Curated annotation (Swiss-Prot):
Keywords: Developmental protein, DNA-binding, Homeobox, Nucleus, Transcription, Transcription regulation. Residues 122-136 have a biased composition (Polar residues). Expressed in the developing brain and spinal cord. Also found in a restricted region of the auditory vesicle during development. In the adult, expression is restricted to the brain. Residues 204-278 form the POU-specific domain. PANTHER family: POU DOMAIN, POU DOMAIN, CLASS 3, TRANSCRIPTION FACTOR 2. It comes from Xenopus laevis. Its main location: nucleus. The gene is pou3f2-b. This is POU domain, class 3, transcription factor 2-B. One of its GO terms (molecular function) is DNA-binding transcription factor activity, RNA polymerase II-specific. Belongs to the POU transcription factor family. Class-3 subfamily.
């Protein structure tokens, strides 16, 4: 590889007439070799004592010189791994030969006698491009900084002459990187504080499921004791507070069958109604007037067990009594006539639900006008042979 690089530089020097065999040029080369000796001693590795490659020292010398024409080479940005052991052995074996062939090329453009830095840049770029395309291995001149044992540092994608720009660029981005997270953290902290305050406030106002269950139980007991129906409560809420609720909604609230959200909305309204009803108990208030206006049907009458037993015994004798019988029965039981009539209607409907299809209903013989002993659907039974 070193021989190939040397041949290319010999062709380049002969074609471009860059090499001049004048005494001044030889003195410049000699001074360059002395400088290289000093640079080589400065860049000796501390781990194994082997100096860096001559090509890398040449890159370092150019980066600190005045010309520095290789700073804009596109191949200097590439991270190319050479064959470490073979390249290092060849470079150590032929270091003096490369210095003698490359010294005039390196020193000459610094004085600018025939070619300026632009010519060196264009010629060097063309030469390195041709070598990169023809040779399978990477170029030694475009290698970045080496670490121990000649391995390429994976973090150094650029040459050493770009360290200053790269460091300043990293510092600039580092400042922005530190500023952006700090601003983001401040915004997140403010947002979390707002959310935390909101959640604390909502948690204090929102009742738990146990609170709702306890309130529903107390509300039902107080409502029944005060003598109001579920429909009365729904109508009173609509008239007093502007939210009309049906009897079904109040029933589902007492049975804990509403959603948690709807239970939480309905609880404060029912609590206000309950407080007003408790404070006005014993005197006619607006709630009583509203309940009286809203009642389209009578209250449900609760019948005592003894009275219900007397009605049951009379139903077994006559499921459908006449009007005179209903009146006499109501007077004997101290009930309203309408209450007794409704009770017999409901009892007959219950008996229909309890009787299987094709069965008989107690008292049906009276409906059809037959005697109790011989129902119409029962005839003389004959044995089947």
């Amino acid at each position: 590889m070193a021989t190939t690089a040397s041949n290319h530089y010999n062709l380049l020097g002969s074609g471009s007439s860059i090499v001049h065999a004048d005494p001044g040029g030889m003195q410049q080369a000699q001074s360059y070799r002395d400088a290289q000796t000093l640079v080589q001693s400065d860049y000796t590795l501390q781990s194994n004592g082997h100096p860096l490659s001559h090509a890398h020292q040449w890159i370092t010398a150019l980066s600190h010189g005045d010309g520095a024409p290789w700073a804009t080479s596109p191949l200097g940005q590439q991270d190319i791994k050479p064959t470490v052991q073979s390249s290092r052995d060849e470079l150590h074996g032929s270091g003096t030969l490369q210095h003698q062939s490359r010294a005039p090329h390196l020193v000459h453009p610094a004085h600018g006698n025939h070619h300026g830095p632009g010519a060196w840049r264009s010629t060097g770029s063309t030469h390195l491009s041709s070598m990169a395309s023809s040779n399978g291995q990477g170029l030694l001149y475009s290698q970045p900084s080496f670490t121990v044992n000649g391995m390429i540092n994976p973090g150094s994608g650029q040459g050493m002459h770009h360290h200053g720009l790269r460091d300043s660029h990293d510092d600039h981005h580092g400042d922005h990187g530190h500023q952006q997270p700090s601003q983001t953290q401040q915004q997140q902290q403010q947002h979390s504080q707002l959310q935390g305050g909101h959640h604390d406030h909502s948690d204090e106002d929102t009742p738990t499921s146990d609170d709702l269950e306890q309130f529903a139980k107390q509300f039902k007991q107080r409502r029944i004791k005060l003598g109001f129906t579920q429909a009365d409560v729904g109508l009173a809420l609509g008239t007093l507070y502007g939210n009309v609720f049906s009897q079904t909604t109040i029933c589902r609230f007492e049975a804990l069958q509403l959603s948690f959200k709807n239970m939480c909305k309905l609880k404060p309204l029912l609590n206000k109604w309950l407080e007003e009803a408790d404070s006005s108990s014993g005197s006619p208030t607006s709630i009583d007037k509203i309940a009286a206006q809203g009642r389209k049907r009578k209250k449900r009458t609760s019948i005592e067990v003894s009275v219900k037993g007397a009605l049951e015994s009379h139903f077994l004798k006559c499921p459908k009594p006449a009007a005179q019988e209903i009146t006499s029965l109501a007077d004997s039981l101290q009930l309203e006539k309408e209450v007794v009539r409704v009770w017999f209607c409901n009892r007959r409907q219950k008996e229909k639900r309890m009787t299987p299809p094709g069965g008989t209903i107690p008292g049906a013989e009276d409906v059809y006008g037959a005697s109790r002993d011989t129902p119409p659907h029962l005839g003389v039974q004959t044995s089947v042979q």
